[in-house]
UniProtKB/Swiss-Prot annotation:
Gene, per the UniProt record: ash4
GO cellular component: extracellular region
Ricin B-type lectin domain segment(s): 448-539
SMART domains: RICIN
Name of this chain's protein: Hemolysin 4
Disordered, as annotated region: 289-322
Single GO MF annotation: toxin activity
Keywords, alphabetical: Cytolysis, Hemolysis, Lectin, Signal, Toxin, Virulence
């Protein structure tokens, strides 16, 4: 795969086995470095899992990827590139996977990427109080084989088979958002207390979609025997999509369908609708002087609603009204003057003669799939572990068969043109991909990550290490180990492991999160002092060793400082909307 490239083309190779070595893992990419290299510098990261052979090691490596990106894939290779100012993940299959070459050949100007990336890293005051989210794109590419689009040349006679497609393919980009909704209200418009995974089909990908044919061509078959009454001719027109189907399945019961879009799609359906689902909060704090010292609070929001255009030119009359299992289906490709089915089933009297040389129906205007549709899934507020989401994208390929029947009355006659609905002359082709979501990812806490800087040093911050031990290390705003979420209970939850909290009863090691007062903290007004609600003492540290302890506000030894500072870190993005 790599050897086939004419040049490196900005491709960076990353062996996933390096994540298994503790020393190499410490030097690995951070989340922000990944974004900077891909979005800022225009690099493409090729992550290679194929060299990992031990049964336990692949899962360990994928856990490391979840720490890096929030998701992982059951694939030997994953290509990370830029798309619309976000990361695009492309799981790769065999060495000749066309998706690899498609991504490598796509030209994104570095200047355009840098401009989008600069906006993503430089947040406004409103955005800094916005909803933390993990957003990424997932690319799916599959060629439709010759065999899958080969059908009988004639419906009436045995004239062999032919290919009914021209360069057919399934090329889709899915957008995935990971968010947290905190409950606000308990009646009517109340928002859920839940972890949210939003999967939607992107409709702006250049050249993307499900494509069978650019234009429709047809072939004619003529009866090779003397005929008074019967089929005189039939026509076989290139294939169209009878319907498109997208199914999202979860590997366990941790995720339930919250909303599927579209919920209805009729042939005359022309309406832009807003998703009826809202995320329960817009941000961690009000934009005020408290900044990162303010804990996460619930408040209402309507900023995260999703507008779904539901009028692609592929609408038909057979769409499913509801999608309780995370499945939605779009109808047949439309013809200029109405639906395909209605057109072909309409019988046209053509008089006593047979028109030769052309089919007696209008030319078709075809367009590949460009629908923006999706599914919103929710996990419980206390959900842990992980869920693998499998996305099946399929097209029901349908050749168009029509025919001319000669009617004989002894005295005179006529011919009729007829279209056919042969279900057995259709074939569904599916492309699948999957990704795994870690429900313990810090984005699902709903809070903005912050650090705790020790004021007795020039540049030391609190960091979680092996076995959840705490130490003072050089500050790094892109480090997950140095990031904490100051949650609605006043706890400092580790972004490295959201099941662990800073505990005043054991400051040498992070403890399992509870609602005990020993894990609840508040900032003294107009000061850099962090007070423990159980001991009513301040968080302090030894100015030589960095060892943490609780101290009284006054009368402390000279080698102790109770000065603690905090600021936002950059391991998650925060936005005011979508």
């Amino acid at each position: 795969m790599l050897a086939s490239l004419q040049s490196e083309q900005g491709l960076v190779y990353l062996n996933a086995s390096s994540w298994l070595d503790e020393q190499q893992a410490a030097k690995a990419l951070t989340r922000d470095q990944l974004r900077e290299r891909v979005l800022g510098q225009g690099e493409r990261i090729f992550i290679d899992f194929s060299g990992i052979t031990d049964k336990a090691e692949p899962e360990q490596a994928r856990k490391a990827m979840e720490q890096l990106a929030g998701i992982s894939f059951d694939a030997d290779w994953v290509l990370v590139s830029a798309y619309k100012g976000e990361l695009l993940f492309t799981p790769l299959g065999p060495p000749d996977d066309p998706a690899f070459y498609q991504v490598m050949e796509r030209i994104d100007t570095l200047a355009g990427q840098g401009k989008r990336h600069k906006r993503s890293l430089t947040q406004t005051a409103t955005a800094e109080a916005g909803l933390p989210r993990g957003a990424f794109y997932l690319k799916l590419n599959r060629k439709i084989s010759v065999a899958e689009c080969t059908f009988p040349r004639s419906r009436t006679w045995d004239r062999g088979d032919r290919l009914f497609c021209d360069s057919p393919n399934i090329s889709l980009v899915y957008r995935v958002n990971l968010e947290r909704s905190l409950q606000f209200g308990n009646t009517g418009s109340a928002t859920p207390d839940a972890k949210i995974v939003r999967i939607s089909l992107d409709d702006e990908s250049a050249g993307g979609g499900i494509q069978l044919n650019e234009d429709l061509t047809w072939s004619e078959n003529i009866a090779d025997y003397l005929l008074l009454d019967g089929w005189a001719r039939d026509y076989a027109t290139d294939a169209i999509a009878q319907d498109y189907r997208f199914t999202i399945d979860a590997s366990n019961t941790k995720a339930a369908v919250l909303k599927s879009l579209p919920t209805n799609l009729n042939s005359k359906y022309e309406h832009r609708r807003i998703s009826g689902f809202e995320v329960g909060v817009t941000g961690g704090v009000e934009v005020n002087k408290d900044g990162p010292k303010a804990s996460w609070r619930r408040r209402p929001s309507s900023a995260s609603s999703v507008t779904m255009p539901t009028t692609p030119r592929i609408i038909g009359s057979n769409a499913r009204p509801e999608c309780p299992e995370g499945e939605f289906q779009l109808g047949a490709g439309s013809i200029r003057d109405g639906g395909v089915t209605a057109l072909l089933q309409d019988r046209h009297r053509l008089g006593n003669g047979v028109r030769c040389g052309s089919q007696p129906h209008p030319a078709a205007e075809l367009q590949g799939l460009r629908a923006e549709s999706g599914c919103h899934l929710q996990g419980g507020a206390d959900e842990t572990g992980s869920t693998e989401f499998k996305i099946d994208s399929s097209v029901n390929i349908r050749p168009i068969y029509t025919g001319i029947y000669k009617h004989y009355y002894v005295v005179g006659g006529h011919v009729s043109f007829q279209g056919f609905e042969d279900v057995d002359k259709r074939r569904r082709v599916t492309a699948s991909t999957s990704f795994k979501v870690d429900w313990n990812h810090p984005v699902f806490t709903g809070g903005r990550p912050v650090n705790l800087q020790l004021g007795g040093f020039d540049n030391r911050c609190l960091s979680a290490g092996a076995e959840h031990g705490l130490s003072a290390v050089t500050c790094d705003e892109t480090s997950a180990a140095q990031s904490f979420i100051y949650d609605q209970y006043g706890r400092y939850v580790s972004a490295l492991d959201t099941r662990r909290c800073l505990d005043g009863n054991n400051l040498g090691q992070l403890q399992s999160c509870r609602l005990s007062l020993g894990q609840r903290w508040e900032w003294k007004a107009d000061s850099d002092a962090l007070s423990n609600l159980s001991a009513h003492q301040l968080l302090g540290h030894n100015k030589q060793t960095g060892e943490l302890a609780l101290y009284d506000e006054n009368g402390n030894p000279a080698d102790v400082s109770v000065r603690t500072l905090t600021s936002y870190t950059r391991i998650l993005r925060a936005t005011a909307g979508n």
